[in-house]
Amino acid sequence: MTTPLPDATELATLIRSGQASSVELVDDAIERVQRLDSSINAVIHERFDAARTEAAGELPDGPFRGVPFLVKDLGCEMAGEPHSMGNRALRDAGVRAEQDSYLYRSISNAGFVTLGRTNTPELGGTVTTEPEAFGPSRNPWNLDHSTGGSSGGSAAAVAAGMVPMAHASDGGGSIRVPASECGLVGLKPSRGRISHGPQAGEGWAGATTDGVVSRSVRDTAAMLDVMSGRHTGDPYVAAPPTRPFADEVGVDPGRLRIGLAPSHAGVQTDPECVAAVEAAGSLLEQLGHDVEIAQPDAFFDEEFSRHFVTIVAVATAVDFVNMGAAIGRPIGEGDVEASNWLMGSIGQSVSAADYIASVNWVHAWSRRLQAWWDDFDVLVSPVIAVPPPPIGWLSDPEHGTERLTSILQFTPQFNVSGQPAVSLPLHWSRAGLPIGVQFVGPIDDEALLIRLAAQLETAAPWASRLPSVYG
């Protein structure tokens, strides 16, 4: 197929106008999943019969009524559906969610028909989707390469045209990295924009959030309206927008002061990733923005990684406790992958005082980082330091962790600071693999990023660029 499939906004319009039915669109999407998934391994839990029943019934009259959708199998719990989190012990025990998350209720109320749940690395702990429990997801642009992670199953599904948009989540880059590696739009919202409830209040000391991967800025903006909102007991609440995010698409962002950070002396960044950022800088100048080489002094603080890893390690140890409760016995070393067992073991050795010290450190560091936006509007950087790596490169038991640390240098900072950041598909490598560019805005100002992203989408459209495995 050489013609791009409609985005979710267009599909919703077709349904409302009577030019298509939800049953037709859901059947078409299921056919694509069944035909393509043997190549990319994106969908690990199917609910096709339930989806067909929902499509034929009375759907909520939301903005995406009847549009097919997929949900990442990490969080976004769906009552009665599997929730394996990429883990074999949860898979083998047949663990299912007891109740819908607030997020999934919002997705359902918007009218989406969910076809299934997508592949994710175990516990979302890395930026490639190669769980031992379900096998690797493969990049539709080149099946020998990674989709990124941890939302790699969702990204592969959207890139291949199975559905126009899919749920994703991000604790250190897990929306932006798969979006970068699969040629999609991937917005990480501000902290407190989307509720984790009722199952949780926060993740990784406030670093995690949900979102989507999509093929258009307008889909991403409209979906942020769907997913946003506070619920009783939420520990963080983002400042509400002045108008719907969907209304920001097409609005002139004005002349922005933009800092460009194509590389850093302490980070070995692939020249093609550097070139992607430099090309984005040139395009921004052509659009009338003020662009200069600049970045926050705190961006590459040498202490950051140590404190972030401490927080993630403790959270992993807590995951083990919760997983044990779900399967009815303690989690042992044979129940999880080696890298996660190591991370959880580190977490178990961290004292309460040391954990609180790390949380306090990242809070103080975040204030230093965010101060840069007092003088600038947007920071532009690589998403990840290499183009999409081969399958197995990051999951290698001997070198995977070292490689992960070396390339994941540009995204976790904004999980910790809580700022919105988006990956846009503006560049392709000489080998034909997507390389996204990251744009970071001030806290709670997704609206600014949406205006800028839509301007860039118009100036350098990507919708017609399709992978070899598509539709």
Please tell me what each predicted stretch does.
Residues F64-A89, G250-P262, I311-Q370, P420-L433:
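Short helix-loop capping/hinge segments that flank enzyme active sites or metal/cofactor-binding pockets
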Residues M1-A50, Q286-G288, G344, Q348-S349, ...:
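An N-terminal boundary/leader segment
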Residues Q19-D27, A56, S101, P244-D247, ...:
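Acyltransferase
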Residues K188-G281, R451, A459-Y470:
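A short helix-breaking turn/cap at a secondary-structure junction
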Residues Q99-H231, N415-G436:
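Short glycine/serine-rich loop segments
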Residues E10-R16, E31, S108, H264, ...:
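Serine-dependent amide/ester hydrolase catalytic core
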Residues A51-A133:
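Acidic/His- and Gly-rich active-site-bordering loop/insert found
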Residues A29, A51, T220, I258, ...:
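Residue-level signal for inorganic ion chemistry
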